[in-house]
Amino acid sequence: FPETYAEMLAQVDSTNWAVVNNPNPTDRLHLRTEPDRKSVSLGKFYNRTPVYVDEIRGEWAHVTIGRDLSGWMMTKYLAFGEEMDKVECAFPQLALIEKYQENVADELAYDYYVFDAPNMSATKTLWNWGEECYLIGVIDDFYMIMDTDENVRYIPQDWLWAGNG
């Protein structure tokens, strides 16, 4: 049984895993429908977004993000193995604007809606603000948000703000 965080990490099997590693951390990496820079983008992802690598074909990797979002990313912008630990996370740290909070118990306990697709008419689900989640990417006017169960959903960018510090 591992006694330290480092020992625990050493036991984790990172085979087939990578993280987004753009040399410009303010930029994001496209997930594309085909292994071609001109194909449709399914979103752009921040540094340290974890991806499962299903296949590598030349300079492209077919990846899955979360449970079921898959497409192609350029391998030169992915970090593998021990290099993954060196990538700084670029996920934005934002707060939900108060008028979009549902079932409010207090300032840290409330629900909010996320959408199954990046449009306001898509099916929506309530998530709880107290549960851990990450803003991993963007598509159009939506952030892509992933919870610890690897569910990827969408939230309008204008529902979130940087807060008062």
Where are each of the predicted segments found?
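Boundary regions of SH3-family modules and the immediately adjacent low-complexity/disordered segments
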Residues: F1-W17, Y52-D54, T64-K99, M146-G165
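Beta-loop motif signature
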Residues: Y5-A6, S14-T15, N22-E59, Q93-M144, ...
